[in-house]
Amino acid sequence: MSEAVLSVNHLSIGYGSRCVISDASFTIGKGELVGIIGCNGAGKSTLLKTIRGMLPKQSGEVLFFGKPMEEYTDRDLAREVAYLQQQVEVGFGYTGQDIVMAGRYPYLKWWERESENDKRLALDCMEYTGTRELADKPVTEVSGGQKQRILLAKVLAQQTPVLFLDEPTTGLDMVYQEEIFRFARELAL
């Protein structure tokens, strides 16, 4: 196996005292494309959120590039792992490009505005996901599948070595479902 990007050791997760996944251990190497399958409610999204640090773990260890997740700041972790959540609500007033630009925030200081380079990168990611023509369109006016592809462009604009895609094909027709998996295969290389 190549260099370990993610190591999960004896991880138990759940809500309160209710354990959803117990004693999970696995390692993912650089360039690997991994899918998590299971029944509805089995804990797949909970696992991703816990590994990403969005939910507390009950026990165990999560390492990114050999470093414990707890040693990362939120900003530093956002430079390592981009996460496309299963359900994302987008408020009024945001355009497609606004959403994609949010992927650049881990690289900006609080006083900085996005650079021309950031804007170019965002548009390139929108081009890659077939959403470039939606850059100036309010996200409230696009279809569910178009919104999903805009959100994929956002995680790509984050330029992280690790992507968590939680049900990335939700709301997409068959053609775009195949495209998402093609993107994932290309990105894993």
Where are these regions (language model features)?
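Conserved structural motif at the start of ABC-family nucleotide-binding domains
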Residues: 6, 21-22
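The feature captures the beta-strand-to-loop junction immediately N-terminal to the Walker
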Residues: 37-39
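Conserved ABC transporter NBD signature motif
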Residues: 60-68, 77
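Conserved ABC ATPase "signature" region
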Residues: 101, 116-134, 159
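Conserved ABC ATPase signature
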Residues: 113, 138-142, 146
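Catalytic Walker B motif of ABC-type/P-loop ATPase nucleotide-binding domains
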Residues: 163-167
